[in-house]
């Protein structure tokens, strides 16, 4: 599966129109793009007690997308649905070079290992993106470690509804904007609720993974192996869909 995380920013005052237009976009994608397996659109979760690193603007819109393959993503990315949406609604979004060129971050990823349960269709899931960085030269070791780790998450955490781990698209013509750090590791994950997320971070599966393999990742605390440096997004879904093909792993 090919995964894309993308971010737009709404110009203040245009929220209602933008959310309605984005909902219509998701419906059109669902109706006309069978190889788009999931297409989820969010605002940041800015509820009290939710920490996001770095803190986002409340005007941010975050897309979490999954495709049959890279070709399906490119078909969407350059296709009529998105092209028409930007032509009509581009002025609602922050832009640097005019209303038909909204400022966007595009993070294109190749799924390494993971699962998505059917419960992920619940729009109230606690959706999280976390981006770690491998230390140079450790890609093979990280790949091997992730297989058993993700299996253990699935087997032991029924409240974890999505847990996919992806590496950056390393092709020379990667459509990522800006180009991604090639040692990035991106977790797209979701839980039944915030409590299930907190439990995941404290339970043995995650803690044992850090103890055994944390040294393979860049650390936020010098000398530590238990504090991987990461940036995060915590999201509230307001539009989108998942097809049955999305339920992998």
Walk through the language-model features, giving the residues of each.
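Short, well-ordered beta-strand segments in beta-rich or mixed alpha/beta enzyme
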Residues: 2-9, 40-78, 124-133, 165-203
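N-terminal/domain-start segments enriched in small and hydrophobic, helix-friendly residues
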Residues: 7, 11, 20-28, 32, ...
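Short amphipathic alpha-helical segments
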Residues: 14-41, 81-85, 89-90, 138-165, ...
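Short, low-complexity cationic-aromatic patches
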Residues: 33-34, 118-122, 135-137
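Glycine-rich beta-strand-turn "strand-cap" elements at beta-sheet edges
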Residues: 40-57, 84-125, 161-183, 207-249
């Amino acid at each position: 599966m090919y995964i894309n995380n993308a971010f737009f920013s709404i110009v203040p005052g245009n929220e209602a129109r933008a959310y309605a237009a984005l909902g219509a976009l998701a419906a059109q994608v669902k109706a006309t793009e069978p190889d788009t397996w999931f297409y989820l659109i969010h605002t940041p979760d800015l509820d009290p007690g939710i920490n996001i690193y770095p803190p986002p603007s409340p005007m941010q819109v975050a897309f979490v997308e999954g495709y049959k393959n890279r070709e399906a993503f490119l078909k969407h990315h350059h296709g009529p649905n998105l092209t028409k949406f930007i032509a009509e609604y581009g002025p609602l979004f922050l832009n640097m070079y005019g209303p038909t060129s909204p400022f966007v971050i595009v993070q294109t990823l190749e799924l390494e290992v993971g699962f998505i349960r059917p419960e992920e269709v619940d729009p109230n899931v606690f959706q999280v993106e976390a981006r770690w960085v491998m230390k140079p030269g450790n890609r093979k070791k990280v790949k091997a470690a992730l297989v058993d780790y993700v299996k253990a998450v699935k087997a032991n955490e029924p409240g974890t509804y999505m847990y996919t781990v992806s590496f950056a698209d390393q092709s020379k013509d990667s459509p990522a904007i800006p180009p991604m750090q090639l040692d990035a590791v991106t977790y797209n994950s979701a839980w039944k609720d915030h409590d299930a997320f907190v439990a995941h971070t404290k339970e043995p599966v995650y803690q044992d993974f850090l103890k055994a393999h944390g040294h393979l990742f860049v650390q936020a605390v010098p000398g530590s192996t238990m504090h991987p440096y990461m940036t995060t997004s915590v999201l509230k879904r307001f539009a989108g869909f998942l097809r049955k093909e999305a339920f992998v792993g």
